[in-house]
């Protein structure tokens, strides 16, 4: 029986290590693993070389509704849903797999900072779980996008089908510099 407990602890520490490497904040680590806070802080310092950042997690569904953040959040959530249907894993494991796939698709050869960090991806799943955010299909392209639940009954056009002018400016600026 003790062997099982040691293996469980190793499994939890491995999850914590993967989460730290992917950029998780302490609140995510404490919520998703059974490792003590003291050990998590030590692990964080060993892996990152600095103490974990202090402060509260972002708490606003509005962040996920801005055009660029919405596209990235929706892409991540669609990957997550696909993995959730095909894999029989713990939700945190599915989150990590989906986040890695998101990074592969959006940043294959780049060292840029991702639009959607792991902590925000985790927060998105929590918002969806408590009903603050839902998924809806675009009426033009039929792609699945995240949106605030209170507007779910209204017709919806995604920012890929109808990009805001600032998105077009950003795209022309980045394509002109390449």
UniProtKB/Swiss-Prot annotation:
One of its GO terms (biological process) is positive regulation of DNA-templated transcription. The keyword Metal-binding applies. Its main location: cytoplasm. Transmembrane segments: none annotated. Zn(2+) binds at residues 138, 141, 158, 161. It comes from the Bacteria. The keyword Metal-binding applies. One of its GO terms (molecular function) is DNA binding. One of its GO terms (cellular component) is cytoplasm. Its cofactor is Zn(2+). Coiled coil: none annotated. InterPro entries: FlhC. It is found in: Cytoplasm. Keywords: Activator, Bacterial flagellum biogenesis, Cytoplasm, DNA-binding, Metal-binding, Transcription, Transcription regulation, Zinc. Binds 1 zinc ion per subunit. It holds the Pfam family FlhC. Functions in complex with FlhD as a master transcriptional regulator that regulates transcription of several flagellar and non-flagellar operons by binding to their promoter region. Activates expression of class 2 flagellar genes, including fliA, which is a flagellum-specific sigma factor that turns on the class 3 genes. Also regulates genes whose products function in a variety of physiological pathways. Belongs to the FlhC family. NCBIfam families: PRK12722.1 (NF009365). Heterohexamer composed of two FlhC and four FlhD subunits. Each FlhC binds a FlhD dimer, forming a heterotrimer, and a hexamer assembles by dimerization of two heterotrimers. This is Flagellar transcriptional regulator FlhC.
